[in-house]
Amino acid sequence: MAADASQLDRLFEVIAARKGADAGSSYTAKLLAKGVPACAQKLGEEAVETVIAAVSGDGGGVVSESADLLYHWLVLMAASNTDPADVYAELERREGRSGLTEKAARGER
């Protein structure tokens, strides 16, 4: 099986199926049971670990931590009842636009 973005969709389906499951049955169910703040904190921790690996020049660490980061992002999406497809649509909307133009349209500096 080739690796591609559809893996994220499949993983999200598994994560979403764990919502409301017994927290003792899986790590994902345990995270989801803790709520959005705990899921957001874990995502932040994984983001920092990814940055540390990148700054350290640890390519393998970047790959591993990025996988953790994406997993925890999907957990947060499920916890906050946000469909990743909405994020994909927003990325598609922004595609081809200058980052500076996009920021100006949002009133950012």
UniProtKB/Swiss-Prot annotation:
One of its GO terms (molecular function) is phosphoribosyl-ATP diphosphatase activity. SUPFAM superfamilies: all-alpha NTP pyrophosphatases. InterPro entries: HisE (IPR008179), PRib-ATP_PPHydrolase-like (IPR021130). It comes from the Bacteria. Pathway: Amino-acid biosynthesis; L-histidine biosynthesis; L-histidine from 5-phospho-alpha-D-ribose 1-diphosphate: step 2/9. One of its GO terms (cellular component) is cytoplasm. GO terms for biological process: L-histidine biosynthetic process. Its main location: cytoplasm. It is found in: Cytoplasm. Its EC number is 3.6.1.31. It catalyses: 1-(5-phospho-beta-D-ribosyl)-ATP + H2O = 1-(5-phospho-beta-D-ribosyl)-5'-AMP + diphosphate + H(+). Pfam families: PRA-PH. Keywords: Amino-acid biosynthesis, ATP-binding, Cytoplasm, Histidine biosynthesis, Hydrolase, Nucleotide-binding. HAMAP family: HisE (MF_01020). Belongs to the PRA-PH family. This is Phosphoribosyl-ATP pyrophosphatase. It comes from Parvibaculum lavamentivorans (strain DS-1 / DSM 13023 / NCIMB 13966).
